[in-house]
Amino acid sequence: MSERKQILNCIDDPQQALIMLKRISARTSLEVQENAISSVQNILTEVKQLGDEALFRLTEKFDGFIPKPLEITPEQTLEAWEKTPTPLQEALQLAKNRIEAFHKYQIPKDFLKEGIHGELLGKNWSPVEKAGIYIPGGRAAYPSTVLMNAVPALVAGVNEIIMVSPAGPNGQLNRTVLAAAYIAGIKKIFRIGGAQAIGALSYGTQTIPRVDVISGPGNLYVTLAKKLVYGQVGIDSLAGPSEVLIIADHSADVEQVATDLLAQAEHDPLAASILLTTESNLAKKINLEIENQLKDHPRSAICRKSLKDWGLIVICKDIKSCAALSNSFAPEHLELLIEKPFEFISQIKNAGAIFLGEWSPEATGDYLAGPNHTLPTSGTARFSSALSVETFMKSTSIINFNQAALNKTSAAIMELANSEGLHSHSRSIEIRRSKPSSDD
């Protein structure tokens, strides 16, 4: 096989595989972030101090136009929907309906339980008042991201959703993105992007309201801005470049595996496409099939860059070894193209989303399966989850002790308070337990 056709590096050493997977996971290095973080901080400070004036200046600097007016009118949003072809309207509506139906299962329930001494203990859930959603834009269009961010907020009961998205070269937002916003019921839309948009949502400007939670993916500057404003507002996650890991055995279809790897690679030169397989012959065929598909691929250059830099095939001794490597990488998307995928789920501990079998390519989840496509990246699936209804909600603990419950537990509470040297904590219990019982 020629070097040209070995577009994906193929290895069979498990230790080398671990090293390479770690390198891929860390592809947005701390050094790169440190180089950008001072610029992001300056942008945020300017927006905080100058508001709309900063947004106009920064957008002219980075995007080449002054976004006056900032806000998209309801008439423009309606017009975008009406000019959307009927098949695409129907696809957007179907996606919205399925995402909404799935996320309704996630609505957390309030509860109030009686403790052993008659005390009442519980938890109440409530939505945030305002949510900001960031939709990547410019030369690209992601209507699915509008639905995946807005619908969970709607299901949560958020009162007001504010959408920001960078305009294209003509200063306009993509029509399909606006159409998605229309069916999601978003009333406030602003044609602003980058770190300055995150600053506007965090601090508020003369035109853009301050929000309580910000969700949505973006480039490095957007991600760093979200990181810096966290604490001022809530955020969904710090999204990195997208990734797929496919586990395939003898039953996998070569064309399907190759296409699914390319479906990830076409996103971005930093996207990672990884195949773990027990079949060395499959690995060879995959490289050939990828080369064949790239001959007329419209994003061939991006795919080649992505696969060359961040693609990998690992030949594993058995399926259990595949699971171990996958868990160490904690992929954003995990496809199980194996004979009995359901029997394998128990071995998977770390993954943003799992796609089981040949009829469940990642694209089903990207668009309209129902579960959210905003998933943890860069190994963060070890400890974090997909965007959900709870992203836009917060819980409040409910505590109602009666006199008997306080008296029964007072000695232990005072002991703990005194151990921490907190006199008034202890006294707040003592003065109550010495009070005559209401039964006396």
Swiss-Prot record:
Active site, per annotation:
332 (proton acceptor), 333 (proton acceptor)
Functional description taken from the UniProt entry: Catalyzes the sequential NAD-dependent oxidations of L-histidinol to L-histidinaldehyde and then to L-histidine.
Q: How is the cofactor bound?
A: Binds 1 zinc ion per subunit.
Q: Which family does it belong to?
A: Belongs to the histidinol dehydrogenase family.
What cofactor does this one take? Zn(2+)
User: CDD domains in the record, alphabetically?
Assistant: Histidinol_dh
The protein's superkingdom reads Bacteria
Q: What is its EC number?
A: 1.1.1.23
Q: Which residues bind NAD(+)?
A: 134, 196, 219
Positions of substrate binding: 242, 264, 267, 333, 366, 420, 425
GO biological process assignments? L-histidine biosynthetic process
Gene Ontology cellular component list: cytosol
> Where would one find coiled-coil regions in this protein?
none
What is the name attached to this protein's record?
A: Histidinol dehydrogenase
GO MF annotation terms = histidinol dehydrogenase activity; NAD binding; zinc ion binding
Q: In what pathway does it function?
A: Amino-acid biosynthesis; L-histidine biosynthesis; L-histidine from 5-phospho-alpha-D-ribose 1-diphosphate: step 9/9
Enzyme class, one word? oxidoreductase
Q: Where does Zn(2+) bind?
A: 264, 267, 366, 425
What reaction gets catalysed by this protein?
L-histidinol + 2 NAD(+) + H2O = L-histidine + 2 NADH + 3 H(+)
Q: Which organism is it from?
A: Prochlorococcus marinus (strain SARG / CCMP1375 / SS120)
Tell me the keywords, alphabetical order. Amino-acid biosynthesis, Histidine biosynthesis, Metal-binding, NAD, Oxidoreductase, Zinc
